[in-house]
Swiss-Prot record:
This is Uncharacterized protein TP_0382. It comes from the Bacteria.
Length: 40
């Protein structure tokens, strides 16, 4: 669903696409810092 979700977000508009991209970046930063890893 990952790739399909990204394509859908791009089709809906730049704002949604940016929101998704920002969210993924935040998740990556948290995972790298180990912030959420212990809780998942």
């Amino acid at each position: 669903m990952g790739a399909a979700g990204k394509e859908g977000a791009q089709c809906q508009g730049g704002d949604v696409c940016e929101l998704v991209r920002h969210r993924l970046t935040m998740q990556a930063d948290v995972l790298e810092s180990g912030g959420v890893c212990g809780r998942i």
